[in-house]
A protein has these predicted regions:
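Acidic/glycine-enriched connector segments
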Residues: 2-3, 14-125
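Active-site beta-loop-alpha junctions enriched in small/polar residues
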Residues: 11
Length: 125
């Protein structure tokens, strides 16, 4: 079976694990029948860490791509996003409408032709 690589990413204040499970289960419901699902995570808190939890609960392979802040400084998150998009087939982003990092992930995934699902949520004020 071929792999289907999906990024689960989003804002760092995202904490609604039930919503993440519902969205991801729906998005992957057909692919899981014909592919090995691989969850790709940037390793940040919030949506990324919930995506890792989801992968473990569902028995999916997990690939972690943590940003190398020491090496790349402020550009590390953007470099990580590009690295993840280069190996992914799709991207599910949980976005508060403000996070620049999540917006960058959405933009780069879209530019690279990935199937992108954006889940807007209110965020924490």
């Amino acid at each position: 079976m071929d792999n289907f690589n999906v990024i689960i990413a989003g804002s760092r204040d995202f904490a609604d694990y039930e919503l993440l499970k519902i969205v991801c289960d729906h998005m992957l419901s057909e692919k899981v029948k014909t592919h090995n699902i691989v969850i790709i995570s940037g390793g940040a808190r919030g949506a990324d860490s919930l995506g890792e939890q989801y992968a473990k609960e569902r028995g999916y392979e997990l690939q972690s791509h943590p940003a190398d802040w020491d090496k790349y400084g402020k550009s590390a998150g953007y470099r990580r996003n590009k690295e993840m998009a280069e190996v992914a087939d799709a991207c599910i982003c949980f976005w508060d409408g403000q996070s620049r990092g999540t917006k960058h992930m959405i933009d780069i995934a879209t530019d690279m032709g990935l199937k992108v699902k954006i889940v807007n949520y209110g965020g924490q004020k």
